[in-house]
Amino acid sequence: MALRAEYENSADIGVFTKLTNKYCITAPGGSSSYKIIEQEVSPKIPCVEATIGGLRIIGRLAVGNRKGLLLPNTCNDQELLHLRNSLPDDVVVQRVEERMSALGNCIACNDYVALVHPEIDRETEEIIADVLGVEVFRHAVGGNPLVGTYSVITNKGAMLAPNTTQQEQEEIGTILQVPLVAGTVNRGSNLLGSGMIVNDWCGFVGMDTTATELSIVEGIYKLRNETDVQFASVMELMK
């Protein structure tokens, strides 16, 4: 199931949140429509409030999966310690000396593979492979190097910006080995990483997301429960 949410009247919930299969990090504050994220995920995984370098744009600055969390060098010692103490013990939390500090914009990953900005530092690439335990591939999405902004990847599926060419889709599909689709959120926005957060069992999209967009998100990431799938199958047969 995927739900709509917003952060202080912003539909760009992915800017302020980081969701993995092992933990969720949210920005301080937010209205009741943002707190729904914590309500949904906290029974299964820890949900932690945090800032990075005093900023609330967690999703843009950090990248992680069930094995680790990478933070930019703007993250101060107190924030680093807070996250290390709050996340599960087997999640490695590490600061990265990368000149492109918006790691969340430059990296898209699941628990096995990472797509990264083609110009990311070689040392950073090695840290990504080591801490997150993934294979790393330098790639663009729709000709844009900000792969974390223009794609969202889980272990079950991936969505790419709509201007992604067929060749790019085939290349990325071969790399990821999961079903993928080109799509939008928030009523036609191609800023997928900004507009949604997804793991293997739940997802959240910006409040402006249409019913059609929401349905595609639920389908590609396999977020529908069995009853929903059966109902959809019946409706398809009735057409």
From Swiss-Prot:
NCBIfam families: eIF-6 (TIGR00323). Monomer. Associates with the 60S ribosomal subunit. The lineage of its organism: Eukaryota, Amoebozoa, Evosea, Archamoebae, Mastigamoebida. Keywords: Cytoplasm, Initiation factor, Nucleus, Protein biosynthesis, Ribosome biogenesis. One of its GO terms (cellular component) is nucleolus. Binds to the 60S ribosomal subunit and prevents its association with the 40S ribosomal subunit to form the 80S initiation complex in the cytoplasm. May also be involved in ribosome biogenesis. HAMAP family: eIF_6. GO terms for biological process: cytosolic ribosome assembly; ribosomal large subunit biogenesis. Its main location: cytoplasm. One of its GO terms (molecular function) is ribosomal large subunit binding. It comes from the Eukaryota. It comes from Entamoeba dispar (strain ATCC PRA-260 / SAW760). This is Eukaryotic translation initiation factor 6.
